[in-house]
């Protein structure tokens, strides 16, 4: 449930160790593209785990590896990095930020989305435009098994437009701050590398 700027920062950091992807626009487009399900379903999240290869809320790396073994273009590698990042993001939040849970154990969505939007837009303003330009040059595949090329392209357009505008939240991030997000970007790399290494074998 990370937002686009965090996904792009994770992808960029991961690509330092996998330089064949570092300048590939399709890889960066893939790194935001599982969330193109919102073009189809809007706020209905009933299909989100499916298009996230069963990694939306919990880590299931075998399903990403199986996907990569069928599809391994740069776009698809980025797609897999996105869904793994979401699973690791949720795990980190549950372990490190119990303050974002309501008394019944569910997520306090008001606090969560305030923080994630404020922080993601701040990260974008702090040098994110270059990554967005690179992502904006990417071309989505026409034969993806889960989402259409048109859905990917519309999501790409909508994300670019949104971040070049005004953040929908106001105030100051309290828990998911830029420091928290940047630390996550670093801390998730070892596990991402390990999973990708299993695919490469």
Describe the function of each predicted region.
Residues 1-201:
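N-terminal leader/auxiliary helical segments
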